[in-house]
Amino acid sequence: PYRFIRSGRVNPGAYPLNMTRKERKMKWNPEEYKEWWTPKWYEAIAKGMFVKRDLKDGQMSRDMTLFVDDDGKAYHIYSSEENLTLHIAELTDDYLQHSGRYIRIFPGGHNEAPALFKKDNMYWMITSGCTGWDPNEARMFSASSIWGPWKQHPNPCRGQNSEKTFGGQSTFVLELPENRFIFMADVWKPKSLMYSGHIWLPIQFDEQGVPFIEWTDEVNLSAQSEWKLVWSDEFNTDGLPDTTVWSYDNGFARNEEAQWYQKGNAY
């Protein structure tokens, strides 16, 4: 059975690693910023007004996910600062506490529902905007280090209804064998939450290695679904294929059938 350990806010007394010395020394009078969404208010948010407000007792943590890196380090990614700014916070080696190391991502960007994954030493994160139960356009960010700097990309979704993330909201990215990834999204039904559901869609990558997501009515999670057979003109010969390029096998079913294959061409 699960055992309750504790509850609490995140990293009390600790400043974000990417908050400047000048920002850490700034003082804010909340009475001057009662009106939200003004340019003056946005500037204060970007410079860490809410971080300073919550510094003593710890940062707000909501709409979150967890990510474990290749080296076993775990990270808590969550919406903070009144749901206005994402934080990435490192956990201790036993995963039971925060280490005190964390960063802010796009302060005031109003991102939530983070889903993080890593491919070819690049970190990718898909999020949503904050529109309550209603779906909205997905956002995507990347960084070569989990500590940033993070770069924003266009909506990763393509095709019909992509501006609404196909009716869903990002929740997790599932990594499969052979460097394949599944984008998972919640489909909320606020009038009757018991009928809420999920979307699972394969993440594809363009020639530059940038992820994108297209709608498909059916997803085959079998590794064999990724196999491809590519014809080579080298087979157009009266004799045997070029043995300096092609390898030979007697067949996987021990039927002595000659099988020729080329690494990287037929797999």
Where are these regions (language model features)?
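Carbohydrate-active catalytic/glycan-binding domains of CAZyme proteins
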Residues: P1-Y267
